[in-house]
Amino acid sequence: MHPLVTSFFHQPSSTWTHVVVDPATQRAAVVDPVLDFDYASGTAATDSIRAVIAHLQASRLKPDWILETHAHADHLSAAPHLREALGGRTAIGAGISDVQAYFGRALNFEPAFRTDGSQFDHLFVDGERFQIGNLPARVIATPGHTRDSVSYLIGDALFVGDTLFMPDVGSARCDFPGGDAGMLYDSIRKLYELPERTRLFVCHDYAPAGREHRAQSSIGEQRRSNIHARDGISRGQFIEMRSARDRTLGAPTLLYPAVQVNVRGGVPPPAESNGVAYLKVPMRAATPRQAGDGARGLDQPVPAAATGTGT
């Protein structure tokens, strides 16, 4: 079956949000909705998700599901805003509980913080099947970038989160907690078992100069030409390349705000006694920054102003 897919690009975080529609029933799912966030002022805004909501309303579409491919570290989720406006069940992979447990400890969350994934309406397990209208959908666990990463196969459309990028960009970093380059390679090869004509939709596109941003590729295109993971690249070669590359990457700009909100299902931390919610930035003693610090802030706090893409 062939769902209709409309994709919305969030320029500040290079993120694609996808609206997936069963044309027979006008039921929909929204994959990876984005909340605008200005780090300097600590201000969240709903401009991006309002465009998605307006599209759904204008097309008279009803979202059954609001699907997260993982707890993102580079943008904040707008899932609660979308659910409040139009309904739909929020869902993520069951591995979120491991991610919640890690960050609850690493960032010293409030004692009442739950690490059972109950901030989401549903936790998917590998191979689980569901529907969007009459469209068959299946969950494929794709760990490697993060422990909770999943891909959604909806009809002939595959939504891979950060598991793969466009072929000329490659693959996602694996230096976050629970990340593993070997696991990512195995996840990619599992996706490559799907038919080559399967449409593949990415969560991010860091387009090289001279190319427009793209949301869609295919399994066949990825197998032929992905610069990191095309056919013929061995597991050992991928691990060596990915590990070396990750050592050169800085932490994402919105790392700390994003993980604190996203592991809570897109909801900010509880307000403190003055009625204001705060986002933490851990700090360690000043030392010379070393090459290859990468995302080490997740294990040893580094200034959150360090920047880097997800590739």
Predicted regions and their residues:
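Conserved beta-strand hairpin/beta-sheet module of binuclear metal-dependent hydrolase folds
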Residues: 2-62, 151-160, 167
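Accessory terminal helices/loops
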Residues: 2-3, 186-199, 203-311
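Core dinuclear metal-dependent hydrolase active-site scaffold
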Residues: 5-8, 19, 126-154
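Active-site environment of divalent metal-dependent phosphoester hydrolases
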Residues: 13, 37-38, 71-76, 97-100, ...
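Divalent metal-coordination and catalytic microenvironments
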Residues: 20, 32, 70, 82, ...
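Active-site neighborhood of phospho(di)ester-bond hydrolases with catalytic His/Asp-centered motifs
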Residues: 31, 62-71, 90-94, 142-144, ...
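Active-site HxH/HxHxD metal-binding segment of metal-dependent hydrolases
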Residues: 35-43, 47-135, 224-225
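Active-site-adjacent loop/tail segments of enzyme domains
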Residues: 171-194
